[in-house]
């Protein structure tokens, strides 16, 4: 048995709301938005200019190198590298070939850990199939983990199919769940919460099993959950959702996706840090202005240390948490 295939123990999970209970104005509005988005995406994608615009966006994709200063308690994580992919929106102009090329580029960076920040698909569950070939390109030693975003939950249905597909393809789902990872002799707690707008996030469940003082990384699709994270001694929160505004005019986004201005980049609250990625894909229109797509590459850095790769130390792995059972 490979050391990258861990034994997992229950820590907490999201209990999805039955489809039959999701009635009323909110459900109808969600479906209207989903259908409208899908229709506009497909119509534009059929036009040559739609594909041309999307190709321009993908050529602008950048890997953003980031360094996270480590607190003394986290010094053992020095040199750990994390690739964070958010808002792929598979099916929204993003086809299987695009995704495979993007994932191959991620693999070439040799991250120790790959994290997905939600909105892997756009409006339909069958868009998951577009991810298959790309996911086969990735095999980070500490594994791959994901949380759902609002687009993954647009239909208000059980996320069992979404979860089981990802698990089948090597991605563990952290939906109000946490796992313990070991790297270079040090441990840290990796956890994720449900989407803030379409789901039922519960950080208490996600942190169940965390040891006192243990370094903690949180995945939350929506950045506005950062206040909860900062109040719970979370060292690093990784979020997406905003697309960096997707369209910015004079440095400002006409459409706001965060009530607190968490549009892109670093934010700090006490000892807790948040990074909001601009994401990889687009939705509705294949246009990005002053908000190029990005894949952050986060390197943990202890003060006074050189960031040198330690290949032999990247293979340790143990987890606690259970996210591989489809609901």
Predicted regions and their residues:
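Non-catalytic terminal accessory segments
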Residues: 1-63, 304-307, 312, 317-327
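Active-site neighborhood of phospho(di)ester-bond hydrolases with catalytic His/Asp-centered motifs
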Residues: 83-86, 113-119, 143-150, 174-177, ...
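Binuclear metal-dependent hydrolase catalytic cores centered on His/Asp/Glu-rich metal-binding motifs
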Residues: 156, 163-171, 178, 183-220, ...
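Core catalytic region of metal-dependent phosphoesterases/phosphodiesterases
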Residues: 94-182
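N-terminal active-site segment of His-dependent metallophosphoesterases
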Residues: 30-134
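Solvent-exposed loop/turn segments at secondary-structure junctions
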Residues: 120-122, 150-154, 179-181, 195-198, ...
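Beta-strand-turn-beta hairpins that frame and shape the catalytic cleft
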Residues: 61, 70-83, 172, 178-191, ...
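Conserved beta-sheet core of the metallophosphoesterase superfamily
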Residues: 223-300, 304-305
């Amino acid at each position: 048995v490979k050391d990258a295939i861990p034994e997992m123990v229950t820590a907490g999970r999201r209990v999805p709301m039955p489809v039959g209970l999701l009635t009323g104005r909110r459900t109808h509005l969600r479906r209207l938005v989903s259908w409208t988005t899908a229709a506009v995406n497909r119509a534009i994608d059929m036009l040559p200019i739609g594909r041309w615009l999307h190709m321009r966006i993908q050529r602008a994709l950048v890997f953003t190198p980031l360094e996270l200063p480590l607190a003394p308690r986290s010094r053992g994580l020095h040199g750990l590298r994390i690739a964070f992919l958010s808002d792929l929106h598979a099916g929204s102009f993003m086809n299987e070939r695009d995704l495979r090329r993007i994932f191959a580029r991620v693999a070439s960076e040799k991250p120790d850990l790959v994290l997905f920040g939600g909105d892997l698909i756009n409006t339909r569950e069958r868009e998951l199939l577009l991810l298959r070939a790309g996911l086969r390109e990735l095999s980070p030693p500490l594994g791959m983990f994901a949380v759902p975003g609002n687009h993954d939950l647009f239909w208000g249905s059980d996320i069992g199919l979404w979860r089981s597909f990802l698990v089948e393809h090597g991605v563990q789902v952290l939906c109000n769940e946490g796992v313990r990872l070991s790297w270079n002799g040090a441990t840290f707690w990796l956890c994720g919460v449900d989407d803030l707008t379409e789901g039922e996030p519960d950080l208490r469940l996600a942190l169940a099993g965390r040891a006192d003082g243990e370094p903690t990384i949180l995945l939350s699709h929506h950045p506005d959950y950062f206040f909860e994270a900062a109040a719970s001694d979370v060292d690093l929160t990784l979020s997406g959702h905003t697309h960096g505004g997707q369209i910015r005019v004079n440095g400002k986004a006409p459409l706001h996706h965060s009530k607190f201005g968490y549009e892109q980049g670093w934010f700090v609250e006490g000892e807790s840090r948040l990074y909001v990625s601009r994401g990889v894909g687009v939705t509705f229109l294949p246009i990005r202005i002053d908000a190029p797509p990005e894949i952050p590459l986060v390197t943990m850095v202890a003060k006074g240390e050189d960031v040198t790769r330690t290949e032999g130390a990247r293979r340790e792995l143990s987890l606690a948490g259970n996210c591989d059972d489809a609901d």
